Amino acid sequence: MKKIYGAFFLLLALLAPAALGQATSTTIMMYMCGTDLQSACVMDMYEMASVDVPDDVTIAVQAGGAYQWDDSDLTGEAVNRFTISYDTFNDLQTLAWQNMGDSQTLCDFIDWAAGAYPADRYILVLWDHGGGYNGVCYDETADYDSLTIHEVNDALYAYQQRHPSFRLDIIGFDACLMATYEMAAHMASYADYMVASEELEPGIGWNYQGWIGDLAANPEMSSADIAVSIADQFMAACLSDNPNDYLSQSVINLSAIPTLKAQLETFSAYLTDALENGQMPTISRLRQRMYSFGKFSDASSDQVDFMSFLDATRQFAPNMASQLEATYRQCILYSTGTDMFDYLTGMSLFLPGDNVSDFIQDFSARYDCGETYPNYSQFVYGYATLLAGGNYHFTLQKPEQTTGAQTGGLFSSMLTTAYVPGGSYVAPDD
C-alpha cells in the first residue's frame, strides 16, 4: 500500500505544474538611447523601478547614446547594462562605448538579454527619438546616427539566424512616428505584435508604471492584452498631462501583414500604371489633401494614414482597394488617439509631399526596400522623382496593355488597363 501511495504522490508531483499551470515568465528588453532625452529616459527607468515586479518578470536594460545621465549610477559615452527591480538597478555593468544607432549593438543587446534572462515571452522596446522611415534611436555620441528600418531588421535577422526558435511577442517603439507600414512589413518576420504611434509622442512617452504594473498584477495576461495596456496607459498618462495634445498609439497584428503586403504590391502596380499614363497631377493633388503626421513640428514626416492613402487612391483600382481595406482592418488589433485627426486608423505609410528632394537623396541608404515590397518602393521613388520634375523608368512587371486580357503571375487577378483615345485615363476593371 505504501508503494501505491508513494507512486501516486510522485505522479501528482510530476503533473502538478502542468495541471495547475506554470507561471509565464516574461523578459522586457529595454533598448534606451538617451540622447537629449536622457532626463526623460531616467524618469522612465524610475517608473519601472516603482513597480514591484514578480520573480518571473525581468526588466533588462541597455542605456547608451548620451554624453551624460541624470542618474549618477549611469556613465555617459558608454553602454550601461542592468536589470530593474523594485527601487533598484541590479548587476550594473559599464561597457565600452558602442553606437546605439548600429545594428550590431542592438543584436548584441538582444543576445545578452535573451541569453542571461531566458523566458517564455519576450518584449523588446526601442526608446528614443523616432522619425518614420529615417529610423529610431539617434545616438548623440555618434553624430546622431540612427537605426534605420534595415538595421532593426538586420539585428533581429542576425539573432534569429543563430536562434531559429526565437520570436518576440511584442516589439514596441516608445518614439515618435514609428507605427508605419514599412516597419511593420519588416517586423512581421520576428514578432507577433507591434506597438507604436502614428503621430509624435510627448516627452513623457509611455507609462511604464502603468503597463508594467498591469503585468505585475497579472503575469498570465496575454501578449495582446499587454500590448493594449501599453496603448491605454500611454493615453491615460498623456491626457492627464495635456488634455489637448495630439496623441495616438496602435497595436498592430503582425500576423496579418504578409497578406497586406502582397495586396499592396498588386495595388501599387495599378498606381504605377496610372503615373505612367498621365495621372501624376491627379495623384499629386490627392496627396496634398492627406494629413502628414508630425507636421506641426519643425518639419513634416510625409507619413500619412494608411486609410487616408487608400481612400484617396481607390479610384485607380476599386475592387483591389476593397480587398486591401478588409485585410488592413485585420492588421489593426487596437488603435486609440485623440479626435484631432481626420484619419487615425492605426498605421501610416510614407508618401512624399514636403520633403521630396531629401527623400530622393536618402532613398538608397534609408528607404529602399525593394527586397521586401518592390512595387510599393518603386512607386514611392518614381512618384517622388516625377514630382521633383525628373524622369523615371518603372521596371516592375505590369500586365500587357491590351483590352481585357487576363494576366498571370503576381497580377493574375488584374485586368489590363483600357485607354480612351486622346489620353484620358480609365481605371482598370479590376
Model region roles, listed by residue range:
Residues 1-4:
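Positively charged n-region of N-terminal signal peptides that target proteins for export
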Residues 7-17:
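Bacterial N-terminal signal peptides
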Residues 13-15, 114-117, 156-163:
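Structural motif corresponding to the C-terminal cap of alpha-helices
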Residues 22-118:
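N-terminal extension/subdomain marker
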Residues 23, 133, 137-430:
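Terminal, contiguous helix-loop blocks that mediate binding/assembly
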Residues 27-31, 58-63, 122-126, 169-173, ...:
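Structural recognition of the beta-strand scaffold that forms the well-ordered cores
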Residues 34, 63-68, 129-130, 175-177, ...:
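Short beta-alpha junction loops
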Residues 113-133:
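Active-site groove signature of glycoside hydrolases
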